[in-house]
Amino acid sequence: MVKIRLRRTGKTKQPSYRIVVADSRSPRDGKFIETIGYYLPTRQPKVLEIKADRARYWLGVGAQPTEVVVKLLKRVNVLDEQGKVIAEA
């Protein structure tokens, strides 16, 4: 199964995350298929950048986002409140 999840990068106590598409069997920071964005929670304000078209593509072909990624995708208007993909405007 393909998942959209966070891949931790950065230094100790200074996390940054890449939003990646990966096989669910691979380790958290292991092999991945594609990077579709990044999230910097330690910056003020928090920085979130997602390639919406690629996220919609992967969701369309059946990739399952993790709970945290669902919240991030809702924040950038890729998913609606029910978790359905919003068509491009």
Curated annotation (Swiss-Prot):
Molecular function terms from GO: structural constituent of ribosome
**This protein's GO CC annotations:** cytoplasm; small ribosomal subunit
Q: Which UniProt keywords apply?
A: Ribonucleoprotein, Ribosomal protein
Spell out the Pfam families in the cross-references.
Ribosomal_S16 (PF00886)
* Any one GO biological process: translation
Quote the InterPro entries the UniProt record gives. Answer: Ribosomal_bS16, Ribosomal_bS16_dom_sf
HAMAP family membership: Ribosomal_bS16
In the record, the note on similarity to other proteins reads:
Belongs to the bacterial ribosomal protein bS16 family.
Q: What is this protein called?
A: Small ribosomal subunit protein bS16
Q: What is the lineage of its organism?
A: Bacteria, Bacillati, Chloroflexota, Chloroflexia, Chloroflexales
